[in-house]
């Protein structure tokens, strides 16, 4: 391949199937070096899926861990109101199972569509009626369940904080002083609590990796790779990529953040000009090499901060880690590809420096 013609490349890297206690840093470093024949480049970006990190480092809670937390902090034999859960077998069913096991009765407020776009009944991809599904989960624990098909945020007010669990994924901060949120439950094990957790088995959930653990992890991977190769790469842990399905309308963002840990070179946002806008407007009279030279000159001499400048209109000035997280999540997939590590190359290059 002629790298003078290649821009950003995103490549999935195979890794062994890890279990708790496996030496994940060694495995990540060795997998990257094997895949690249030890030919890393400065500013390559290495992404590791949050699941790989959490599973290998034992970031789990059991259903009974959650039950114990609820009964200690909310009380025994309570009627617990569950407000606006996500509609997901993977993300919420096990949490609801624990709530039902801990409570006397459960009331669930369920709006037509959940926070990330899943519909309550006749889901377009799973075919599930989540009212029936969630009610069955509660009943299977021997607990009474009442479903209210409304947005609970508009209806609950006052009362005892220990009666309500607010299940919002991204607006929970505004309710933390009023109700228990998913971020509160079992947050002694992870600073995100149950936010971003996944079903691991019928009695266990995998937690989203904590901020401190994640930061230590990415910095150690970066150091190891630099020690071996002399190359300075960037490293991040990524979860859901935040892209939105245009057909189902589902927002792929059931985690609390896209990246719980990343090296300092990934701070910031792109600072770009719109090439086609310059080609069609300012340099409409140029062609060929003269047009190319003019555009390269614009890129090389652009302001260091184009925020609010019309030259940057339409250039997607979002955070690097959010943009890269989307790219990595789509590259690695969520099923059986077996590539939980992603290498992104040339991400920080532009038209002027290939």
Where do the protein language model's features map onto the residues?
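Conserved mixed alpha/beta catalytic, RNA-binding, or beta-rich assembly cores of soluble enzyme
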Residues: 2-42, 51-354
């Amino acid at each position: 391949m002629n790298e003078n013609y290649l821009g950003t490349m995103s490549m999935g890297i195979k890794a062994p199937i890890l279990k708790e206690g496996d030496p994940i840093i060694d495995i990540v470093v060795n997998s990257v070096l094997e895949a690249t024949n030890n030919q890393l480049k400065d500013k390559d970006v290495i992404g590791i899926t949050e699941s790989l990190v959490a599973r290998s480092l034992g970031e789990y809670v059991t259903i009974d861990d959650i039950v114990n937390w609820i009964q200690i902090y909310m009380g025994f034999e309570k009627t617990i109101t569950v407000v606006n859960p996500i509609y997901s077998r993977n993300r919420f069913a096990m949490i609801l199972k624990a709530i039902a096991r801990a409570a006397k009765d459960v009331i669930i407020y369920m709006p037509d569509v959940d926070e990330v776009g899943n519909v309550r009944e006749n889901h377009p991809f799973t075919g599930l009626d989540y009212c029936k599904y969630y009610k069955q989960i509660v009943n299977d624990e021997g607990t009474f369940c009442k479903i209210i098909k409304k947005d609970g945020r508009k209806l609950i007010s006052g009362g005892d904080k220990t009666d309500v669990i607010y299940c919002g994924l991204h607006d929970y901060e505004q309710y933390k002083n009023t109700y228990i949120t998913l971020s509160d439950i079992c947050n002694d094990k992870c600073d995100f609590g149950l936010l971003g957790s996944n079903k691991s088995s019928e009695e266990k959930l995998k937690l989203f990796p904590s901020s401190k653990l994640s930061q230590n992890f990415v910095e150690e991977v970066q150091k190891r790779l630099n020690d071996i190769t002399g190359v300075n790469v960037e490293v991040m842990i990524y979860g859901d990529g935040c892209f939105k399905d245009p057909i189902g309308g589902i927002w792929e963002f059931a985690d609390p953040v896209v990246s719980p840990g990343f090296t300092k070179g990934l701070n910031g946002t792109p600072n770009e000009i719109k090439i086609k806008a310059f080609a069609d407007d300012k340099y409409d009279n140029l062609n060929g090499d003269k047009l190319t030279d003019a555009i390269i000159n614009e890129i090389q001499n652009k302001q260091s901060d184009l925020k609010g400048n019309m030259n940057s209109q339409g250039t997607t000035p979002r955070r690097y880690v959010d943009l890269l997280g989307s790219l990595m999540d789509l590259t690695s997939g969520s099923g059986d590809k077996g590539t939980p590590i992603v290498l992104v190359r040339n991400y920080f290059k532009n038209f002027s420096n290939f």
